[in-house]
Design a protein with these regions (language model features):
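A well-ordered secondary-structure block
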Residues: 91-172
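C-terminal motif of bacterial Sec signal peptides marking the signal peptidase cleavage site
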Residues: 19-23
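Regulatory sensory/coupling modules that transmit signals to nucleotide-handling catalytic cores
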Residues: 14-17
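Bacterial N-terminal signal peptides that target proteins for export
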Residues: 1-11
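Sequence-pattern detector for short linear motifs
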Residues: 8-9, 37, 138
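Short, well-ordered surface patches within globular domains
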Residues: 26-100
């Protein structure tokens, strides 16, 4: 009888641990691997879509975006998690902003994350549509960062199980 109680207790602990690991709707993403082919396309489309502003790709801003990518992935994961824990999300966003502030080293720049659901292919049209949809948020983000006349950008892209994240860093 004592062995049976111990076995039941061990099984119960195992079941509880398994339930905790699978409780959230979005599993933690794999390490943020860059999709360099899509990244090149997004950079080209961004230059084409921003030709009126003479946008150019800047390798230094792309490097900043790359260094911020892992924390940006964690922020999107926290936002998409179910049930959502606002403390985890706010901590992830704060960490993303801290890494960004450290990496930009005083440059005036804005971090602009854009994510697409996994069923949505990232194309020039979907990128333009996302910008049109998020235009007010993007403008507000740029202005808060002090970027009033964007001319340079960097971009990294990662495909996760639940989404594709396009992470822009925009500067004057």
């Amino acid at each position: 009888m004592k062995k049976m109680k111990r076995l039941v207790a061990v099984l119960l602990v195992g079941i509880m641990a398994l339930a905790m690991l699978t409780a959230c709707g979005v599993t933690p993403s794999a390490p943020s691997m860059r999709d360099t082919a899509l990244e090149r396309d997004v950079a080209q489309w961004t230059v084409e879509l921003g030709k009126n502003q003479n946008l150019t790709l800047d390798p230094d801003l792309t490097e900043i975006s790359n260094k911020c990518l892992p924390t940006a992935v964690k922020a999107v994961d926290a936002r998409l998690a179910f049930p959502r824990d606002w403390n985890v999300y706010n901590d992830a966003v704060k960490k993303r902003e801290t890494v960004f502030a450290e990496e930009r080293k005083g440059k005036t720049a804005a971090l602009v994350p854009v994510d697409f659901p996994s069923g949505t292919e990232v194309t020039k049209d979907t990128l333009a549509h996302a910008y049109a949809t998020l235009r007010m948020d993007v403008q507000s983000n740029l202005e808060q960062a002090g970027v009033y006349d964007p001319t340079k950008f960097g971009v990294t892209v990662t495909k996760q199980k639940e989404y594709t994240l396009v992470l822009f860093v925009v500067s004057e």
